[in-house]
């Protein structure tokens, strides 16, 4: 685990510059770029198929490897659409889960079976969430179970052209595109700007950009993030920040199994939390009793994404709740795209 974390940290630094490490990896990035271009062209030629479903599909993803705030963006979008009276569902591959079956993620679904991010999305929105190896299969299963669903939000999948999309939302942070190179020499999963693949619904006219950092560029909508009014215990009670100074007389220690743990630790400190120790874990890390034993005795603070896995071993742990607020102009633009996509398939019965 330590080697993996060290390697990830080294690559994250290398991806911000075209230095020695990035240049050494460039030949592999060139080969990867060729494969990406070939796959895209196969969809254009019809040799690989894109399939539609009878609902509007909004794909929310990122071209940057690592966390940029994609899942909080999904939650914000789903919550807004629900507030507008829309019937919304979510599909995902459920990265890191042990099962490959197509299934609905419910409140009692084990995180290991449904995936930590789908579990978090369902908990936050109560929307139907389906996971499968094929996003198209997940979307069909969702529509079969909930046939009145109007809009499907796809958690990740910008590069998965098998499911036709009506709208794309691409999420960035202050790193933007790093050194501008593709993996593994740079942080990009795909070329940017992304080439159009009209047959799959992927074109710049249907694309919205979100920046979760502090310095959005022109054309990007800003998302502001905070940790809310305090932390949550296993019963859902809020523990205000002011009470954490001497919480249970134990030292406060934070852990995070996310793409960029340092960002979470810094947000805790900005809320006045004095951390005696931090433990950075790989993204989607499967918690085990000995993982937490290394921190004891202490009061554990974890991310909302990790909470269910941590509470399985320590019911006293406290969880953060990430609050992300998108500017109103983003939702105005999203609504315009929805109206444009709405007419060919669904009757406009909401008056929007």
Language model: regions and residue ranges:
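C-terminal accessory "lid"/substrate-recognition subdomains
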Residues: 2-15, 177-299, 346-352
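Short, flexible loop segments at boundaries between secondary-structure elements
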Residues: 281-286, 316-342
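Residue-level signal for inorganic ion chemistry
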Residues: 31, 71, 121, 155, ...
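Short secondary-structure boundary segments
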Residues: 92, 133, 303-305
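Short, high-confidence coil segments that cap the C-terminus of an alpha-helix
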Residues: 86, 146-150, 165, 249, ...
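Walker A (P-loop) phosphate-binding motif
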Residues: 40-107, 198-201, 344, 350
């Amino acid at each position: 685990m330590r080697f993996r974390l060290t390697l990830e940290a080294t690559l994250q630094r290398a991806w911000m510059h075209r230095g020695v490490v990035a240049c050494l990896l460039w030949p592999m990035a060139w080969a990867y770029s060729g494969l990406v271009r070939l796959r895209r062209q196969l969809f254009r030629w019809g040799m690989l198929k894109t399939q539609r479903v009878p609902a509007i599909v909004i794909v929310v993803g990122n071209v940057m490897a690592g966390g940029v705030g994609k899942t909080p963006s999904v939650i914000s979008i789903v919550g807004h659409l629900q507030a507008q009276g829309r019937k919304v569902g979510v599909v995902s591959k459920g990265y890191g889960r042990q099962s490959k079956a197509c299934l609905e993620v419910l409140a009692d679904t084990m995180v290991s079976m449904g995936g930590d991010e789908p579990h978090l999305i369902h908990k936050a929105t109560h929307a139907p969430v389906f996971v499968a190896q094929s996003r198209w299969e997940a979307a069909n299963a969702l529509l079969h179970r909930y046939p009145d669903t109007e809009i499907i939000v796809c958690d990740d999948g910008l590069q998965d052209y098998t499911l036709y999309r009506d709208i794309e939302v691409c999420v960035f942070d202050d790193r933007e595109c790093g050194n501008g190179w593709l993996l593994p020499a740079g942080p990009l999963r795909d070329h940017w700007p992304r080439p159009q693949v009209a047959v799959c619904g992927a074109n710049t006219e249907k694309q919205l950009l979100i920046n979760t950092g502090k310095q959005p560029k022109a054309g990007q909508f800003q998302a502001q993030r905070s940790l809310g009014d305090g932390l949550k215990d296993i019963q859902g009670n809020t523990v205000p920040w002011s009470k954490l100074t001497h919480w249970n007389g134990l030292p406060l220690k934070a852990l995070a199994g996310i793409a960029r743990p340092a960002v979470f630790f810094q947000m805790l400190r900005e809320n006045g939390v004095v951390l005696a120790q931090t433990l950075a874990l790989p993204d989607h890390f499967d918690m085990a009793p000995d993982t937490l034993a290394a921190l004891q005795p202490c009061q554990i603070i974890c991310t909302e994404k990790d909470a269910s896995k941590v509470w399985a071993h320590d019911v006293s742990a406290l969880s953060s709740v990430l609050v992300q607020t998108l500017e109103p102009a983003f939702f105005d633009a999203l609504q315009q795209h929805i109206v444009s996509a709405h007419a060919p398939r669904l009757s406009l019965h909401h008056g929007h």
